[in-house]
Amino acid sequence: MDKKVYQCTVSAPVNIAVIKYWGKRDVALNLPTNSSISVTLSQDDLRTVTTASCSEKFENDTLWLNGNAEEIFANKRLRVCVEELRKARLDLEEENDDLDKIGALKLHVVSENNFPTAAGLASSAAGYAAFCEAIARLYDLPWTPTQLSRIARQGSGSACRSLFGGYVAWEMGELHSGADSVAVQVEPVENWPEIRVAVLVASAAKKGVSSTAGMQATVASSTLFQHRIQNIVPQRIQEMKTAIRERDFETFAKLTMTDSNQFHACCLDTFPPIFYLNDTSRAVIRVVENINATAGKTIAAYTFDAGPNAVIYFLEENSEIVLNTLYAVTKNAEGWSKQYGSSPVTVDSAAANIVSSGISRVILTRVGNGPRVLTIDESLIDASGNPKFIGSH
């Protein structure tokens, strides 16, 4: 008889921080120097799909990411996640004789992103969230997203926030073990579904300084950073939670922009300095300022992670003015599904020229839900447990 292949397929979302995570107090456990808050983006537009499978016939624990195979145990972060999840399954099997004995079987995990990996679009967050969610579901672990977030965090810090939809906080915790450094939902999508998002991709090339290396250089050398984590972020976390709960966009927007600016100031204060923003990024900031000046209030907010791509938040009710303006300066970029009308905003001409030539792709999305379990039809492995390689989307 052919040996059975057990499998489960999930998708997980990208999240974009509005109060930034940057810096570890414990590198091995991925414990952060400060708490952070993010918005989960809709999986209709950006997602990682992962199938986790196990079988007696598999010889090695293997991950295929976008078609490239790697041994799971050769990657320390993947290995830590698998070891913890496997131990939890084996414990369940020891407690309950009726369970299939799958915990000790080798894993085949296949994962695909529908966006460029390592291009500043938080691919590791969605990737590790999907990886941990798929294996936890395969193993039928009776865990809450917060419990699973402790494991996902050890793969990629920001991944713990992709286990929830809506608005999510990664609480830094206090314990040396990291047991209390977990993600919690601040509010579900339903509390504030009107948030819209425009991602302006400035470069799909791999960034110069990786987040992992960059953040530890900042921790080691930036005096501004110490002020940030001790005196600024704790209050901002509380203010941001209140703004989200009260659906107060102006406060949400101001906190988002000032926190992005301070994060990049800390990068600049690192020695030697780290430059994630480029001329295109700075020009996008000008465009957002022009939009808000014309509106007479803050209706759009920019934020940048460890790369030049801009993420712009706005409310559905202001979509027309925001998108008409962005379209006017990026109409040659890929991703626009229709033409937009004229905008009342006068954009600084130098900024408009830089944005026009510097933005290659636009992704329009919105706040979205947490990981989904997908059907067998969407599985990335065939009946024998090998990748289908359906190709990139």
From Swiss-Prot:
It comes from the Eukaryota. Keywords: ATP-binding, Cytoplasm, Lipid biosynthesis, Lipid metabolism, Lyase, Nucleotide-binding, Nucleus, Steroid biosynthesis, Steroid metabolism, Sterol biosynthesis, Sterol metabolism. It catalyses: (R)-5-diphosphomevalonate + ATP = isopentenyl diphosphate + ADP + phosphate + CO2. It is found in: Cytoplasm; Nucleus. One of its GO terms (molecular function) is diphosphomevalonate decarboxylase activity. InterPro entries: GHMP_kinase_C_sf, Mev_decarb, Mev_diP_decarb, MVD-like_N, Mvd1_C, Ribosomal_Su5_D2-typ_SF, Ribsml_uS5_D2-typ_fold_subgr. GO terms for biological process: farnesyl diphosphate biosynthetic process, mevalonate pathway; isopentenyl diphosphate biosynthetic process, mevalonate pathway; sterol biosynthetic process. GO terms for cellular component: cytosol; nucleus. Pathway: Isoprenoid biosynthesis; isopentenyl diphosphate biosynthesis via mevalonate pathway; isopentenyl diphosphate from (R)-mevalonate: step 3/3. Coiled coil: none annotated. (R)-5-diphosphomevalonate binds at Y21, W22, G23, K24, R77, S156, G157, S158, A159, C160, R161, T212. Diphosphomevalonate decarboxylase; part of the second module of ergosterol biosynthesis pathway that includes the middle steps of the pathway. Mvd1 converts diphosphomevalonate into isopentenyl diphosphate. The second module is carried out in the vacuole and involves the formation of farnesyl diphosphate, which is also an important intermediate in the biosynthesis of ubiquinone, dolichol, heme and prenylated proteins. Activity by the mevalonate kinase erg12 first converts mevalonate into 5-phosphomevalonate. Homodimer. Belongs to the diphosphomevalonate decarboxylase family. This is Diphosphomevalonate decarboxylase. It comes from Schizosaccharomyces pombe (strain 972 / ATCC 24843) (Fission yeast). The gene is mvd1.
